[in-house]
Regions:
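Non-catalytic DNA-recognition/assembly elements of restriction-modification systems
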Residues: 1-23, 28-40, 134-183
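DNA target-recognition domains and sequence-specific DNA-contacting regions of bacterial/archaeal
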Residues: 6-136, 187
């Protein structure tokens, strides 16, 4: 192992924000304006009229489908203002670990042996935080973050552009279909 690196536990590199989660029923969500993303264990489930979190976070499935067929955790790299139900762990990094570093780490960490539940899979907080990992030096974390931040910044930028293009399509397509806008009259 390189100098300054050591064995440790996931608990040493993550901040858990699970205590802030508030589940909403489908009936509650139906009555809300669709403004902010509402995430579940594995995906975006809906939109709601308020948010709990604002920033960049890593969501790791807690119960339900929590791992893929190879045993790696289901991860969601999320940003902005959003709400999370109680089926996903909400993580940020600490001790030199960025959210992007956590994403990279968990993408390569098989957690199959940490999953419990015969009927419904679950990765408990205790099992998550007890995962053995190699913790690199702070200097390595800084250098690694310098390398990956531009990549994740581009990912976030591409997502925003996709959202804008989707919104534009959803606005223009109905107008094209009902004749409100004619393609012949558009100058390029």
């Amino acid at each position: 192992m390189p100098d300054g690196w050591r064995m440790g536990k996931v608990s040493e590199i993550i901040e858990l924000h699970d205590s802030k989660r508030i589940p909403l029923s489908g009936q509650q969500r139906e009555k809300m304006k669709k403004i902010y993303p509402y995430y579940g264990a594995t995906s975006l489930m809906d939109y709601v009229d308020n948010y709990i979190f604002d920033g960049i976070y890593l969501l790791l499935g807690e119960d339900g489908t929590v791992i893929n067929s190879e045993g790696y955790p289901i991860l969601q790299y999320v940003e902005g203002k959003f709400w999370v139900n109680n089926h996903a762990h909400i993580l940020t990094g600490k001790n030199g670990f960025s959210v992007e570093m956590l994403y990279s780490l968990f993408s390569l960490t098989n957690v199959k042996d940490k999953v419990t539940g015969a009927v419904q899979q679950k990765i408990s907080q205790g099992n998550l935080t007890s995962i053995d990992i190699i913790i690199p030096s702070l200097e390595f974390c800084i250098k690694f973050n310098e390398l990956i931040q531009p990549i994740f910044s581009q990912i976030r930028s591409n997502r925003k552009e996709n959202e804008n293009l989707t919104s534009l399509r959803d606005t223009l397509l109905p107008k094209l279909m009902n004749g409100e806008i004619e393609v012949d009259s558009i100058q390029i």
